[in-house]
């Protein structure tokens, strides 16, 4: 049995085994990594069995990130804030450490793109200088959004604004962060955002964390939000531009990216958590991008 695996349902499409193999090859390590199809009934038993039989590291994908959070003995601060776990490491004392590397993956990809600086400040694309303040529009309030909010709030002098079809869900998230002293987050009623005069508010970064791209649907936002310098990021990706990326380009943004870089970056941090070695992301990212474009 491999010492590393991904647990989820479905997982047959997962790129994690190949990503892990490429990272491992860089350091001359064994690249074995399994796919584990779990169900609601057997997830806990399957995961515990994996670690009992010598497993060392696990990735967790949908729909088990919240359940994985509940079974870990120790948790990183960012996983506690998001109440989700996507990476587990078996520690020397046998306990399980849970982390969520999604946010780190996003931030590192934004740094790779030179959208934010090394020290977590927004970069003004019009002059390539550090911005004094920045506004982020986050579309969605589900698991994908929750996993990245903690790191977004750490960007210097930024405010995160959430929109969601169900306004109550966005409100609940904002209230939670306000209760722990994080005041640089708010939510906007979708109807207000769609009004032309409100849509003229400047957003430096718009992130689609909703499932709309997976369903080939557009999120309900106005084209008035888009300027040539608006950075647009879709957490999802495909073998061509997502519908959100296409829409942002069509409406004038010169900075539109899908989530493939985030996927590779979060996997790189998981690898670092397990092995203490930082793999090279650009080589793997370029290989996967080329494969998707075939």
UniProtKB/Swiss-Prot annotation:
Shikimate binds at residues 14-16, 61, 86, 102, 237. It catalyses: shikimate + NADP(+) = 3-dehydroshikimate + NADPH + H(+). GO terms for cellular component: cytosol. Its EC number is 1.1.1.25. GO terms for molecular function: NADP binding; shikimate 3-dehydrogenase (NADP+) activity. InterPro entries: Aminoacid_DH-like_N_sf, NAD(P)-bd_dom_sf, SDH_C, Shikimate_DH, Shikimate_DH-bd_N, Shikimate_DH_fam, Shikm_DH/Glu-tRNA_Rdtase. NADP(+) binds at residues 77, 140-144, 235, 259. The keyword NADP applies. It holds the Pfam family Shikimate_DH. It comes from the Bacteria. Homodimer. Involved in the biosynthesis of the chorismate, which leads to the biosynthesis of aromatic amino acids. Catalyzes the reversible NADPH linked reduction of 3-dehydroshikimate (DHSA) to yield shikimate (SA). This is Shikimate dehydrogenase (NADP(+)). The lineage of its organism: Bacteria, Pseudomonadati, Pseudomonadota, Gammaproteobacteria, Enterobacterales.
């Amino acid at each position: 049995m491999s010492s590393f695996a991904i647990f989820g349902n479905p997982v047959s499409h997962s790129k994690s085994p190949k990503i892990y193999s490429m990272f491992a090859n860089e350091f001359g390590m064994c690249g074995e990594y399994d796919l584990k199809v779990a169900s609601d009934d057997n997830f806990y038993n399957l995961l515990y069995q994996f670690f009992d039989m010598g497993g060392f590291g696990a990735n967790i994908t949908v729909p088990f990130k919240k359940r994985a959070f509940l079974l870990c003995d120790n948790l990183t601060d960012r996983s506690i804030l998001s109440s989700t776990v996507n990476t587990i490491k078996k520690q020397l004392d046998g306990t399980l450490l849970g982390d969520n590397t999604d946010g780190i993956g996003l931030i590192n990809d934004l740094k790779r793109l030179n959208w934010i600086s090394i020290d977590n400040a927004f970069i003004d694309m019009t002059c390539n200088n550090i911005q004094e303040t920045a506004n982020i529009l986050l579309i969605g309030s589900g698991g994908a959004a929750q996993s990245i909010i903690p790191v977004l709030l750490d960007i210097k002098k930024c405010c995160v604004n959430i929109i969601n079809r169900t306004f109550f869900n966005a409100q609940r998230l904002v209230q939670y962060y306000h209760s722990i002293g994080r005041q640089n987050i708010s939510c906007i009623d979708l109807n207000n955002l769609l009004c032309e005069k409100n849509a003229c508010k400047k957003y430096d970064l718009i992130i689609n964390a909703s499932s709309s791209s997976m369903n080939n649907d557009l999120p309900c936002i106005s084209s008035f939000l888009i300027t040539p310098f608006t950075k647009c990021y879709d957490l999802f990706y495909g073998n061509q531009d997502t519908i959100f990326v296409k829409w942002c380009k069509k409406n004038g943004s010169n900075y539109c990216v899908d989530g493939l870089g985030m996927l590779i970056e979060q996997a790189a941090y998981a690898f670092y958590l397990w092995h203490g070695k930082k793999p090279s992301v650009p080589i793997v990212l370029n290989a996967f991008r080329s494969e998707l474009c075939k």
